[in-house]
Amino acid sequence: MKEKGRLLKDSFIIGATGLSLNLVGLWFNIYLSGTLGTEGIGLFQLIASAYMLATTFATSGINLSVTRVVAEALSLPETRKTATRRFRKCLAVSAALGGFACLLLFVFSGVIARSVLCRPETEMCFRILAFGLPFMSAGSCLNGFFVAERKAYKTAIANGTEEICKIVFAVLVFALHPPTSLVSGCVGLVLGLVGGEAVSCILAYAFWLADEKTLPRSKGGTAGTVRKMLAIGAPVAASSYLRTGLTTVENLSVPVGLVRYGMTDSDALAAFGAVKSLAVPVIFFPASFMYAFIKVMIPEVARAYTLGKTDAIRERGGHIIRLTLVFSSIVTGIFLVFYAPLGALLFDNAETGKLLLYLAPLIPAMYVDGVADGILKGMDEQVAVMRYNIYEAIIRLVVVFTLIPVLGFAGFMATVYAGNVINTSFSLARLRRKAGIKTEPFGSVVLPTCLTVAAGFLFKSVFSFWQSRFSVIVEVFITAVLCAAVYAFFLFPKLREKIRASSPRQNARNRVRRNIL
């Protein structure tokens, strides 16, 4: 019971922080759409896509490998006292990797701007972004340590500080020097991004210095730490390098394909920016609490895997997958019903709200893919995850080159669907094969979606008299709470028993039995 309480507490901390940060981030994206326009956001997304290659090189595999190395060291009595020294080695490797990535990006920023983006004016953005890589690499390592140490609140505070600082710095830059062009706006954004990374890393390092004084120390051997770190992180890194490379090519090719279809360059950038920076963040916004469970459960699955507790993996993993599918299906139903008023409320544009409708059926696959990958990584199945990510990236790239020039925006949507469905299918099949975790599509996806759609239309008609753009908030809230309560009643037997036990009829029966006795 104490263990479950701790897990729920950690999940709540990370989830509440993630929800708050996503809300702030969503506001910031909407603010940017008004400041730079969707075309400016699209240009920044292209810069970010190219920048992903450098961030992947600087951080890929670090967080997971540090979490695994430290969690395994802390779980065994004979290695517990060496956890701090093992982490120091991991931090040194991370810092070196981040510094090298910084040097590479700074030197080749001009080549990337001219030859990759074909926009020489963006060179300054890459030069500024290079200085954020060492902070990003070290911060990823430090956050991995906090997760392994079961101190989720420190990761939450560091990440929260980072996101808030990014936004505050960018808004200050725009206030002091209003953007006069798309590129000047992007420069303001990257300045905020680098500033946020630096503050977050410094804060996380201060947390670690305080923790180091309380952890047990030993002069025991730590040989093999770097080798183990590389063994865990290398497959993830290799997958990320290849997948990020393919994803970068895909993202850079989408506007090109839309132009070939017949769109203007401005319209193509605007469409790309609307999907990546407006619709997708809204789609993933409700998942904050769900992804909190992933971060907390990875070290738990790693410990269970280390100790050979396959039943625990199957029970916990199956429960998480089932909850994820039900939760994502409720979200799907809400977007299917309320896409238009949500678009008008969030973007002041019902047409942009249609993007929520187009992406809504894909939400269960989007959500459960991240959960399944997290469980598999905890079971030392990162090589399989690597393969599936590569398969997805290749398929998406093929669809980009073949369908977008022919179908335009519909081809863009086909790209998103094809990759997510295939990757999720592979991951769930692997979980079933390795851990016996099964899924029930009808009970976990179809029924909750239909229930939510029915409830949504019901409350939409009930509140039809309320002609306000904010009425959708009440309608969505009531629909979500009702559907979640109904499914919680069926999914949690203990909760169902408590409700029945506290009912007036059951209380009357209990009194009669006591009187008879």
Label each region the model flagged.
Residues D10-G25, G192-W208, A223-P299:
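Transmembrane helical elements of multi-pass membrane transporters/channels
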Residues S60-S75, I283-G308:
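Helix-loop junctions and terminal segments of transmembrane helices
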Residues K460-L517:
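Membrane-proximal transmembrane or re-entrant/amphipathic helices at the cytosolic face
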Residues G98-G245:
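Hydrophobic transmembrane helix module of multi-pass membrane transport proteins
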